[in-house]
Curated annotation (Swiss-Prot):
In the N-terminal section; belongs to the HesA/MoeB/ThiF family. UBA4 subfamily. InterPro entries: MOCS3/Uba4 (IPR028885), Rhodanese-like_dom (IPR001763), Rhodanese-like_dom_sf (IPR036873), ThiF/MoeB/HesA (IPR045886), ThiF_NAD_FAD-bd (IPR000594), Ubiquitin-activating_enz (IPR035985). SMART domains: RHOD. HAMAP family: MOCS3_Uba4. It comes from Drosophila yakuba. Zn(2+) binds at residues 231, 234, 306, 309. This is Adenylyltransferase and sulfurtransferase MOCS3. Plays a central role in 2-thiolation of mcm(5)S(2)U at tRNA wobble positions of cytosolic tRNA(Lys), tRNA(Glu) and tRNA(Gln). Also essential during biosynthesis of the molybdenum cofactor. Acts by mediating the C-terminal thiocarboxylation of sulfur carriers URM1 and MOCS2A. Its N-terminus first activates URM1 and MOCS2A as acyl-adenylates (-COAMP), then the persulfide sulfur on the catalytic cysteine is transferred to URM1 and MOCS2A to form thiocarboxylation (-COSH) of their C-terminus. It is found in: Cytoplasm, Cytosol. The gene is Uba4. ATP binds at residues 101, 122, 129-133, 146, 190-191. Its cofactor is Zn(2+). CDD domains: RHOD_ThiF, ThiF_MoeB_HesA_family. Keywords: ATP-binding, Cytoplasm, Metal-binding, Molybdenum cofactor biosynthesis, Multifunctional enzyme, Nucleotide-binding, Nucleotidyltransferase, Phosphoprotein, Transferase, tRNA processing, Zinc. NCBIfam families: PRK05690.1.
Length: 453
């Protein structure tokens, strides 16, 4: 074997070992959190997630108070809702997974409508980038647990609503225990592993799952595992590749779009609880915010050979969903690993060694993002232009110099790797690398004054 081949194989093995160690560290952290949770507040958790079977002493309301009548009068006078509908809401419990752009308006409307008990799950903390769409949080609660921040706001809105916070990640190890105590589950998450986890758990526990999503100017909504409707796996039996997944942190979203879908998730939950109207099971509502149009399309029915919800399921217990999907169960930076170490450059090395030397620095972010902030030396060529080679005429003379290093960067160091692969194939004799971690790494490691978004 050639020496260069040996070096390449060593680099590949070292990279794989590093990735496996990182995965092991995440699993060990999950185990530590679970053990700490069980040992420190097992009895409290039983009260939090206890349903009528686990907590037989929980009161069942059979009449409305004068305050209830005054507070909910505008919906009480609806002929198809009335007193019985309000009592069903008062005796109901809803679990909201994710207190972000979808979960905040959903929780707000459910609390306002008189849902008796809300469970709030979110591992994250409030930060300024949340405020344009996550309307329960405020400037004064920056750094607070999102679940706790939402609880404070909801109790100000309706002090009669019983609210329980789960400020933790939802894992295979704790999902069934938590979900068991609620009547309806709302998927307000922003990642694929959690969607599979919630769907599988709700099938196993026979809970309806109201699932919403929003990205850019568009939103979608459906109800899984209700009546004869399908589960999430019936529609998506195989997860998408990680590089094909875009969340609102990468693609952006308008706050009013998440508000629209979140409010409609609350509406579907109320319909399920009360038995009101035609629940969105077996149908997908699609909202186009740019045109203001709503479409309602029929989706496939239950898959007879579904691995989870069929008569003879192959999956009867929750699995490792991060491994199944090949991505993290969070909406935080989810770094791709498409390049070898010799094809990448740290921001510190770039700043120390290369920045003052002749080179071509290409920022592959969309133009709208480039206008927010940019490095002084960077030229903007969006990734779509890299992939269709429309940039070649623009840099014809520079690209003739095979000694000129080409550095590609983006916001987080993911799109730049895709760009490197394409440019290296086009110019195999050039030195083409990307900046690890992108502009986020630049802010964290080189220039703290550089804006981060």
């Amino acid at each position: 074997m050639m020496e260069s081949e040996v070096d390449s194989e060593q680099s590949r093995l070292k990279r794989e070992i590093a990735e496996l160690r990182a995965a092991l560290n995440r699993k060990e952290q999950c185990l530590r959190e679970l053990e700490a949770s069980v040992s420190s507040d097992a009895s409290a958790e039983e009260q939090v997630v206890g349903n009528a079977l686990e907590s037989p002493g929980r009161a069942v309301h059979t009449k409305l108070t004068n305050d209830d009548i005054a507070r909910y009068s505008r919906q009480l006078i609806l002929p198809d809702f009335g007193v019985q509908g309000q009592l069903k809401l008062k005796n109901s419990s809803v679990l909201i997974v994710g207190l972000g752009g979808l979960g905040c308006p959903a929780a707000q409307y459910l609390a306002a409508a008189g849902c008796g008990r809300l469970g709030l799950i979110d591992y994250d903390e409030v930060e300024r980038s949340n405020f344009h769409r996550q309307i329960l949080h405020s400037e004064s609660r920056c750094g607070m647990s999102k679940a706790e921040s939402a609880r404070i706001a909801l109790l100000e809105l309706n002090p009669h609503c019983e609210i329980h916070c789960h400020s933790r990640l939802l894992y295979s190890q704790n999902a069934l225990h938590i979900i068991r105590g609620y009547d309806v589950v709302l998927d307000c998450s922003d990642n694929v592993p959690t969607r599979y986890l919630l769907s599988d758990a709700c099938v196993m526990l026979r809970k309806p799952l109201v699932s919403g999503s929003a990205l850019k100017m568009d939103g979608q909504l459906t109800v899984y595992n209700y009546g004869n409707g399908p589960c999430y796996r019936c529609i998506y039996p195989v997860p998408p590749p990680p590089e094909a997944v875009t969340n609102c942190g990468d693609g952006g979203v308008l706050g009013a779009v998440t508000g629209t879908i979140g409010a409609m998730q609350a509406l579907e939950a109320i319909k399920v609880i009360v038995g009101l109207g035609d629940v969105l099971a077996g149908r997908l509502l699609i909202f186009d915010g740019s045109s203001g149009l709503f479409r309602n399309i029929r989706i496939r029915s239950k898959r007879p050979n579904c691995h989870v919800c069929s008569a003879q399921p192959l999956i009867t217990e929750l699995i490792d969903y991060e491994m199944f999907c090949g991505m993290h169960a969070t909406d935080k930076d989810n770094p791709l690993q498409l390049l070898s170490t010799d094809e990448r450059l740290s921001v510190k090395d770039y700043h120390a060694k290369l920045q003052a030397q002749p080179h071509l620095l290409i920022d592959v972010r969309p133009t709208a993002e480039f206008e927010i902030c940019q490095l002084p030396e960077a030229v903007n060529v969006p990734l779509v232009e890299i992939l269709d080679d429309s940039y070649l005429k623009r840099f014809g003379k520079q690209l003739e110099d095979k000694e000129l290093p080409i550095i590609l960067l983006c916001r987080r160091g993911n799109d730049s790797q895709i760009a490197v692969q394409h440019v290296r194939n086009r110019f195999p004799m050039h030195s083409v690398r990307d900046l690890i971690g992108g502009l986020h790494a630049w802010t964290n490691s080189v220039d703290p004054s550089f804006p981060i978004y």
